[in-house]
């Protein structure tokens, strides 16, 4: 059957090609100019539709799905400021290498800069934050243009998910009629009667995607592998550092490399390597407490590592980053995108290659001679740190104690999304390694507190695992409208709300002693979040102590629906506990 008009033809062709390329869901926001795309997606039988009233929340929701799946969920919005609301999520996706596909509807070109309603300059709206941009021509039932459209869809998916994944922006212009209104074939908006309906006039007998893209795995050459192997074999004090990476080094490849070298593993909670069966299987320690001891004076007495193999982005932990900065050794950074994720500028070698292929190649013939005393040093430091955390949690409760309990009590499997600011830092320091299938996610590309709830719910929509969101009060407030997705997108979550009434992280900075600190940095708000229970049809409960939290959390992760568990803290008190733990661990290590 011939499409009723050229806009419908164009949109259905684009959507059909995206589906052929593997797309199975979309995030739609209401608007008129995007009607052709909205109808085409909504009526496609193989598309799951997530409807969002707010484009900013929609973009972070799509970001969360992509973090969990590694594949883009297209976003569709109308013209004007709607597209600008995608920008914060685009920045995060760009800087953390997460695939996004943005389909922004636009007006015909003659209306740009004319004063026409809801018309802004959308060309290259996101600047250099996208991997590829295309200003699409106006729809036309012409075979060459439709072949271009199909090829563009294939390229958009390939650019978004390639070796350097990230956002792609297609700016889609439409004239009226925007609805699937039948138009005469001799009308500019009409479709010729002889247009081949099934093939849309340009499929030329192909099955599946119009263009099938294949990407090879970048493996380091033999000379490079041998050079790195020589360094690893000569090392007595080697380390493997796994930084944040949604789709990074696999646990299997890590096991092979760690077993071959004997190097301790320092695993960021966002590396996907701090948790899993390998934690107990490996003979070398998988370390998660380094943030609590690497900055201590006692560690200054340790010998430097003589080689470090690094995967993923720059670590969350500042003490670890500074430890690597001050280490006088070779540091091999494996980065498949060649993105130079190296904020301390200490890497001596950049390997632009696939992490698994690199680790497997290095493990193939490497036989490490790492000193047993080097491993024991980290084992002892880890034990000291976790003993101190356990002892402190039994006597007092602080924000980090909540993260420790969440990590220990989360079901296996589970998806955990951790907010920026203090929650991710406390997760890094107090989330102990565990033999459990925990997928821990966070927005550490630009590290903003915007869109946290929406990103978490997007991740939850892509898995059947229980979802746990740990967020602070400012992040909860900042993205409160994201809670609407709980009902509209059928996502359940356990939300752990750490409420210290403002910006607790600023207690870690020298500005704490300045007269402007309270009003301009800590910014206490005094908000009561309990009314979100009625507004968003969730369950809200405030707990008073550790026993209540552990009981309520254990119940929530086994219960349908969404429960918000609020725990209130004094930010200054929590900061004091962190300092006390640092001193306790340092004193114990110094006395060993």
Curated annotation (Swiss-Prot):
It is an enzyme of class 2 (transferase). InterPro entries: DHS-like_NAD/FAD-binding_dom, MenaQ_synth_MenD, MenD_middle, THDP-binding, Thiamin_PyroP_enz_TPP-bd_dom, TPP_enzyme_TPP-bd. Binds 1 thiamine pyrophosphate per subunit. It catalyses: isochorismate + 2-oxoglutarate + H(+) = 5-enolpyruvoyl-6-hydroxy-2-succinyl-cyclohex-3-ene-1-carboxylate + CO2. GO terms for biological process: menaquinone biosynthetic process; organic acid metabolic process; sulfur compound biosynthetic process. Pathway: Quinol/quinone metabolism; 1,4-dihydroxy-2-naphthoate biosynthesis; 1,4-dihydroxy-2-naphthoate from chorismate: step 2/7; Quinol/quinone metabolism; menaquinone biosynthesis. GO terms for molecular function: 2-succinyl-5-enolpyruvyl-6-hydroxy-3-cyclohexene-1-carboxylic-acid synthase activity; magnesium ion binding; manganese ion binding; thiamine pyrophosphate binding. Keywords: Magnesium, Manganese, Menaquinone biosynthesis, Metal-binding, Thiamine pyrophosphate, Transferase. Its cofactor is Mg(2+); Mn(2+); thiamine diphosphate. Belongs to the TPP enzyme family. MenD subfamily. Homodimer. This is 2-succinyl-5-enolpyruvyl-6-hydroxy-3-cyclohexene-1-carboxylate synthase. It comes from Haloarcula marismortui (strain ATCC 43049 / DSM 3752 / JCM 8966 / VKM B-1809). The gene is menD.
């Amino acid at each position: 059957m011939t499409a009723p008009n050229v806009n419908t033809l164009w949109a259905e062709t684009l959507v059909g090609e995206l589906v052929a390329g593997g797309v199975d869901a979309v995030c739609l926001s209401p608007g008129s100019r995007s009607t052709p795309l909205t109808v085409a997606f909504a009526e496609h039988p193989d598309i799951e539709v997530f409807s969002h009233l707010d484009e900013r929340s929609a973009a972070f929701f799509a970001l969360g799905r992509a973090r969990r799946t590694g594949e883009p969920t297209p976003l569709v919005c109308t013209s004007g400021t709607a597209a600008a609301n995608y920008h914060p999520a685009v920045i995060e996706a760009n800087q953390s290498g997460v695939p996004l596909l943005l389909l922004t509807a636009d007006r015909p070109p003659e209306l740009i800069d004319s004063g026409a309603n809801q018309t802004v300059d959308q060309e290259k709206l996101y600047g250099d934050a996208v991997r590829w941009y295309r200003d699409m021509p106006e729809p036309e039932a012409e075979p060459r243009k439709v072949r271009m459209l199909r090829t563009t869809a294939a390229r958009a998916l390939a650019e978004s998910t390639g070796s350097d994944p990230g956002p792609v922006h297609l700016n889609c212009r439409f004239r009226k009629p925007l609805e699937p209104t039948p138009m005469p074939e001799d009308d500019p908006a009409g479709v010729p009667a002889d247009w081949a309906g099934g093939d849309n006039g340009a499929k030329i007998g192909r099955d599946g995607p119009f263009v099938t893209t294949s990407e090879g795995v970048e493996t380091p050459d033999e000379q490079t592998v041998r050079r790195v192997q020589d360094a690893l074999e000569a090392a007595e004090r080697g380390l493997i550092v796994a930084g944040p990476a949604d789709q990074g080094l696999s646990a299997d490849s890590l096991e092979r490399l760690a077993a071959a070298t004997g190097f301790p593993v320092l695993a960021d909670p966002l590396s996907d390597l701090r948790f899993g069966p390998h934690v107990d299987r490996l003979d070398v320690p998988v370390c998660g407490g380094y943030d609590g001891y690497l900055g201590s004076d006692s560690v200054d007495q340790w010998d430097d590592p003589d080689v470090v193999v690094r995967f993923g982005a720059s670590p969350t932990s500042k003490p670890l980053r500074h430890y690597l900065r001050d280490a006088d050794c070779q540091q091999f950074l494996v980065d498949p995108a060649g993105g130079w994720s190296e904020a301390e500028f200490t890497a001596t070698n950049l390997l632009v290659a696939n992490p698994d292929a690199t680790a497997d190649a290095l493990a193939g013939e490497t036989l490490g001679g790492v000193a047993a005393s080097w491993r024991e040093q980290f084992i002892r430091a880890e034990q000291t740190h976790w003993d101190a955390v356990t002892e402190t949690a039994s006597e007092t409760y602080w924000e980090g104690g909540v993260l420790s309990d969440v990590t220990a009590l989360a079901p296996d499997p589970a998806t955990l999304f951790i907010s920026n600011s203090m929650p991710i830092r406390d997760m890094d320091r107090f989330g102990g390694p565990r033999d459990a299938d925990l997928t821990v996610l966070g927005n550490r590309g630009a590290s903003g507190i915007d869109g946290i709830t929406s990103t978490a719910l997007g991740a939850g929509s892509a898995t059947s695992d229980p979802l746990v969101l740990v967020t602070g009060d400012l992040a909860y407030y900042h993205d409160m409208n994201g809670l609407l997705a709980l009902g509209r997108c059928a996502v359940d979550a356990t939300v752990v709300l750490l409420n210290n009434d403002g910006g607790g992280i600023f207690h870690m900075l020298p500005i704490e002693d300045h007269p402007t600190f309270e009003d301009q940095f800590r910014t206490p708000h005094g908000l009561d979040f309990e009314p979100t229970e009625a507004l968003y049809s969730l369950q809200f409960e405030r707990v008073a102590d550790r026993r209540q939290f552990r009981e309520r959390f254990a119940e929530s992760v086994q219960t349908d629906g969404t429960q918000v568990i609020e725990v209130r803290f004094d930010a200054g008190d929590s900061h004091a506990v962190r300092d006390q733990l640092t001193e306790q661990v340092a004193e114990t290590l110094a006395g060993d």
